């Protein structure tokens, strides 16, 4: 989700980076001590400092490399862009997790992929890690986030309405805020990654 958002931005901005597939050992022994959490994306800068959380990461990277910036200069447009980014990051998370972890074909594919990635080079079995991640993601990010059979239709409708509005907005422009990508485009991309 957020790794896709960050990687899309890094590619767009032409920022040299090395994408590292993490396993449980890297998460535990490197990422956790450096960031305080066992989550990706996380990025180590050339000066040794670590960054986490895509919103502040992209703000910092944009200040260092952003020519042109992905943030609107006009204060009102800037505020709206941040508001819409927050919506895409925080509200479209639910439908994204719902579609990834609520359906057998989706969670089967993802549990196999995550099991392979997280166990690669470790002593842990891929199948076990895959099943762990499947249930962790479902229980934490679907069920515990409030998605239940009685409100699945609302989650589906939220995503459908959002896609319809994006399609309408993009009929006369290549990007959501105009002629070039902005933070808004990258935020919406996360839920579709």
Model-identified regions with their sequence ranges:
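GST-like domain detector, emphasizing the conserved glutathione-binding G-site
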Residues: 1-124, 176
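GST-like fold's C-terminal all-alpha helical module
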Residues: 94-193
């Amino acid at each position: 989700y957020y790794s896709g958002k960050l990687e899309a931005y890094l590619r767009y901005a032409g920022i040299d980076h090395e994408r590292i597939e993490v396993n449980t050992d890297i998460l535990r022994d490197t990422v956790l001590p450096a960031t305080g959490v066992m989550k990706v994306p996380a990025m180590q800068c050339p000066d040794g400092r670590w960054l986490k959380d895509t919103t502040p990461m992209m703000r910092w990277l944009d200040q260092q490399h952003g020519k042109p910036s992905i943030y609107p200069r006009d204060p009102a447009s800037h505020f709206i862009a941040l508001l819409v980014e927050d919506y895409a990051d925080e509200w479209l998370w639910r439908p994204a997790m719902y579609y990834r972890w609520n359906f057998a074909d989706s969670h089967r594919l993802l549990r196999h992929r995550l099991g392979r990635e997280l166990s690669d080079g470790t002593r842990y079995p891929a199948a076990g890690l895959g099943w762990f991640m499947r249930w962790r993601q479902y229980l934490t990010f679907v069920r515990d986030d409030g998605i239940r059979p009685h409100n699945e239709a609302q989650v589906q409708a939220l995503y459908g309405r959002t896609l319809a509005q994006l399609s309408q907005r993009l009929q006369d422009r290549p990007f959501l805020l105009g002629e070039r990508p902005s933070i808004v485009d990258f935020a919406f991309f996360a839920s579709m990654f």
